[in-house]
Swiss-Prot record:
It holds the Pfam family adh_short. The active site is at 207 (proton acceptor). The keyword Oxidoreductase applies. It comes from Zea mays. NAD(+) binds at residues 59-83. Coiled coil: none annotated. This is Sex determination protein tasselseed-2. Keywords: Developmental protein, Oxidoreductase. One of its GO terms (molecular function) is oxidoreductase activity, acting on the CH-OH group of donors, NAD or NADP as acceptor. Required for stage-specific floral organ abortion. The gene is TS2. Gene3D superfamilies: NAD(P)-binding Rossmann-like Domain.
Amino acid sequence: MHASLASYAAAAMPALDLRPEIAHAHQPVMSPSHHGWDGNGATAVPTPMPKRLDGKVAIVTGGARGIGEAIVRLFAKHGARVVIADIDDAAGEALASALGPQVSFVRCDVSVEDDVRRAVDWALSRHGGRLDVYCNNAGVLGRQTRAARSILSFDAAEFDRVLRVNALGAALGMKHAARAMAPRRAGSIVSVASVAAVLGGLGPHAYTASKHAIVGLTKNAACELRAHGVRVNCVSPFGVATPMLINAWRQGHDDATADADRDLDLDLDVTVPSDQEVEKMEEVVRGLATLKGPTLRPRDIAEAVLFLASDEARYISGHNLVVDGGVTTSRNLIGL
């Protein structure tokens, strides 16, 4: 197994879901305990579970595709009115249209404070001055040439760009979400970080620094906002096979043909990989995983975000929920 391929697979935040396991937003949520036998020898009739975000208002940045799309769909399925905040107009509007009137789209570049402010204000005006959940999901990986990956030769402008999107974007989201939530003395802010914020050597320097920043911001903001009844948490996922990840690996291992000026971070720029490439990357991820059996998919990360966003986590704040099958616990990443 190639060490660099393994590093990308372990740490990179995915941009697109190639094989979605995402239920439609309007599909009823069924209780697993009500499937099969009812204990009296008869087959029980499935009954809907309570929707965990029923009536709540949520903003999901980077919600047009990938993990963000999985979060949007799951939030809507659980009764939330969801605002997709993304730079991909076509994908965002298409997703909102597909999910119905409870989901809407607003264009938002999270590295621009005016955009973040407008997105929050737009959600408040649309939903009666209410914002219950803000999910900082938008992020970029950064350029993946050999020079860009080295501490000896990285480009300062590119480093700054990645931190502006990933770290500043999360901070601005927390700032304006808290502005809306604090007066109501309630709310949940959930950010998507990475296992690269837990173990060193798993990702590019700018990306790793930005994800550490998200964990630090989460803890600091949780300390400040607890007095206002606002919870702040983050989720750090393991690798998921996505076009962004696969394209980054291609660029990083073909410096002879790589265009150092090409952005491979944004969903709009990636080339959809073949099924064989997806299977290869998923094989790499499964090989690195210490929990054998399931393959981590965007839906798994969305479920973790849903938990932290919901009242089921009402006394959890300042926490980094690592979704990695125990990799960072055992630190058993052979080949990295």
